[in-house]
Design a protein with these regions (language model features):
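Beta-lactam-recognizing serine transpeptidase/beta-lactamase-like catalytic domain environment
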Residues: 2-9, 20, 87, 187-235, ...
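Single conserved hydrophobic/aromatic residue that forms the stacking wall/gate
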Residues: 367-378
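Residue-level micro-sites within transmembrane alpha helices that shape
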Residues: 49, 237, 358, 375-376
Length: 378
């Protein structure tokens, strides 16, 4: 009896370590399985997140890249959609003849040439909305059917905020002068009109484009001076000069200057007021209201030039506007090494300070906005 008990106890002692080892192995397997499962789930979520990000934020940019060969494939499968004005008038459409040959047609000819752009060069709206114009709403079955039958799908139409009557008025007002006119809706930032001259007839692009490319930059018809031309901002820049002064001097209401019709600073330049106007005693508000060059050509000497520069860069001077269409970078050059004359000239928006008409208007829109706005979305 005692021997049986001992034998039974011995068996229990002998089997227990094996059970423990098996359980440890099983636990280790479960842990490895969980780790592998976690890795696969994490990878799947990362891929899914990237696909969502790509389709929502990057698809248009990638597809519109001129090096993306997919564009060529889309143009072979999709008839480019129309570009419409705010009232529905057609600004660009695709004409198809009996033989199936496609021609991009611009009904308003020169009037909208720069803002609508060229489909062949991917400029203006033609470039910004290239992805949408070549995208279709058809389902996969319809697309496969079109591919098999050799028929093309039709791309989306793109509706702009452009107003033909305003565009034509701006075009007529600019006449034969070189320059640009831009009009925007303050509450939304929508572009209502954009004219640049010299201009061109986009319907002649197939035959004339190579010749246009050869024009001197000063006479270039392809240059959109509304976004790519750089000009002195003039008195419109005094807003930024005044703003920086107010930021640096809480007692700005005590500012005082006696205008004699011009201002001179030792080592600098004599800066006259417009038409030699003598404004007399000026505080900051009066100086701003009178656009007194005497006030603003001297006020820069009281400013911290690094802070002045930072303010201007906050308004996208020395930065890309990132507005979709082709644009030049506006310049503000003052720094600690700037000379007296340059500081004088910059204070009144002259000298080396340069801005595009579009950029200047976007800044002006911020003054009229009742709430803060990202200038890139003005």
């Amino acid at each position: 009896m005692n021997q049986q008990v001992k034998t039974r106890n011995l068996k229990k002692k002998n089997t227990k370590p094996n059970d423990i080892v098996d359980k440890k192995k099983q636990g280790l397997r479960n842990r490895e399985t969980n780790v592998i499962s976690f890795i696969f789930v994490a990878l799947f979520l990362m891929m899914a997140s990237y696909l969502v990000y790509f389709n929502v934020f990057e698809a248009s940019t990638i597809v519109n890249n001129p090096y993306n060969k997919r564009i060529d494939n889309l143009e072979n499968k999709v008839v480019r959609g129309n570009i419409l004005a705010a009232d529905g008038q057609i600004l660009a459409e695709t004409d198809i003849d009996e033989d199936g040959n496609e021609t991009r047609v611009y009904p308003f000819s020169e009037v909208f040439c720069h803002v609508v752009g060229l489909a062949s060069a991917k400029t203006g709206v033609e470039g910004v909305a290239n992805y949408e114009l070549l995208s279709t709403s058809g389902n996969i079955i319809n697309q496969l059917s079109d591919d098999l039958s050799g028929e093309k799908s039709v791309g989306y139409d793109v509706v702009t905020t452009l107003v033909p009557k305003l565009q034509e008025a701006a075009y007529k007002a600019l006449g034969s002068n070189k320059g640009a006119v831009v009009a925007m809706e303050p509450s939304t930032g929508g572009v209502l009109a954009m004219v640049s001259k010299p201009d061109y007839d986009p319907n002649e692009a197939p035959e004339m484009y190579s010749e246009w490319l050869g024009y001197d930059s000063s006479d270039s018809v392809l240059l959109n001076r509304a976004t790519q031309g750089l000009y002195s901002p003039g008195s419109t820049f005094k807003v930024l000069t005044a703003l920086e002064y107010v930021r640096e001097y809480p007692d700005y209401e005590n500012y005082s200057f006696d205008c004699t019709g011009s201002a001179y600073v030792n080592g600098g330049t004599t800066i006259p007021c417009y038409n030699g106007s003598v404004h007399g005693h000026q505080d900051l508000k009066l100086g701003f209201a009178n656009s007194c060059n005497g006030v603003f050509s001297t006020i820069g000497f009281r400013l911290n030039l690094s802070k002045y520069r930072q303010l201007c860069e906050d308004f996208y001077y020395n930065k890309n506007l990132d507005i979709g269409i082709e644009s030049s970078v506006s310049s503000f050059t003052l720094d600690e090494n700037s000379g007296v004359s340059e500081i004088q000239e910059t204070g009144i928006g002259q000298g080396k300070t340069m801005v595009s008409p579009m950029h200047n208007l976007m800044i002006c829109l911020l003054y009229t906005s009742p709430s803060p706005r990202d200038m890139r979305r003005s």
